[in-house]
Every structure is written in structure tokens, then in C-alpha cells.
């Protein structure tokens, strides 16, 4: 988080610790098939990219090129959106946008101690449950392993943080969660359940679109840094940093539960719930926008 203010130097190698512990835990539990190797190779590319950025400066263009290579590795290994009503020439570009978006979304919300890691843990928990419900044990184990690594990291990342994940960690967990969310089976009961991954990862997705919208209104570049994140606005309103972070955890948990619930509904019921959630998101964005960040 470039928007963080520190009174003391804090190490940025937490992301590398998450990556290594994730690899070790999987090596002890699973045998590696093509899809898993693709996910791990893509994650490794992202980690190298993040380390370079944490210890130097990468232009947005170079960073996007590196992320694109990682996404192409995933698609080549068979990790992409697979829905019967979407042809491959739509699925591949959509998968690319999804993975690039989620990878950067977790980097975008990393503006407070424990925020990105804790939200990512909640997302991992939801994906784990989806994997168990669908008897997809590889997905469940990978999500559980990632969640365990994040929980261990949170002990040292919660306010006041002793270590940060940096771009290395935020982009890595974004790539992992984007991949794992994409390969789950959500549409057993209704086609509208394909929205479940968006709900599971709803907090970083909401913040990304919210920040881009505010910057657009101000005539700024959407990739410019600015203190317009939902978490910073909540803190500006009246919450403390810890209260804001814990509230974000709660919202992420509720969205994960909503995703699991929507998977069990009939089609019409799912449509109604989605409309309600979209309305709540729009109203929340409107209220957050009204908070004056200039004072």
C-alpha cells in the first residue's frame, strides 16, 4: 500500500513468506497435476514481478506485461472460465480481464494494516466451502492452505503491523484467489450462480470500481494513487483503523455467505437476491462518495 503512513520502518517481505509457506504446504499434501502446476507457475511469475516492484519501481505497462504472461500460463494450463453458454472466444478474454482485475484489486485495497490479508482469508474460506460442497478437494485444499498462510501472516500484519505483504503478497493472493474462484462449479442449481465468484471477491472488486469511478469524475488517471478507497473513507467518517478493517472482514464474510446461499436458490430467487445486492452496492457507493476527503 503506497498510501500507508509508517512511523517506523516495516519489512515488506511478508508476501514472500506467504508464497513459500503456501508452496511447502501444498507439496506436503497434494500431487501436482497440469492445472495446479499452471496456477503455481503463474503465482511464481507474479511473486518475481512483485519482488522487483517492492525493491525498485516498475512502470504500470511493464507490470501489466508480467501479469499478462502469468494469465496466459493459466489459460494454457486449462484455467479459464468454463460456462456452457459462453464460447471460448468470449471465455478467454473474459478470463484474462477477471484475473488481471482480481490480481490488482487486492493490491488496490492494501491500504491499511491487515485489510487485504484479512479480506483474502475470508475469500479463501468461502472458496474452501465451495470446493467441499462440489467434492473438488484440490480446490478446497489449495484454498485452505492459502487461508492458513494468510491467518498466520495476519498475526503480524494486523495493526500495528510488524510486516507487510507488499506488491509481492497482494498480487500473489489476488492471482491465487482469482484462479481458485474461477475453477469452482457454481451453477448446479441455477445459471445465475455464476455471479458467486464476484460476490466472494466482492470487497476488492467494489473498491476497485469505486476508486476508478471517483478518479474518473475528478479527471484523474484511473491508475493514479489517491485516498479514495472505501476503507479510507470509512476511517475519515468516524471509524478507527481497526474498526474499519474488522468491518471489512464482516462484509467479506457476509458476501461469501450470500454467494453460497445463491448457489442453492431457484433461478427467480437468485435473480431477486442479485438485484437486492446490486442495489445495496450502489447505495453504499453513493453514501461513501458523499464523505468529504478534503478536510
Segments (PLM) and residue ranges:
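Cytosolic, membrane-interface loops and tails of multi-pass inner-membrane proteins
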Residues: 1-11, 210-242
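Membrane-interface capping segments at transmembrane-helix boundaries
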Residues: 158, 283-295
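Hydrophobic alpha-helical segments of multi-pass membrane transport proteins
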Residues: 207, 280-285
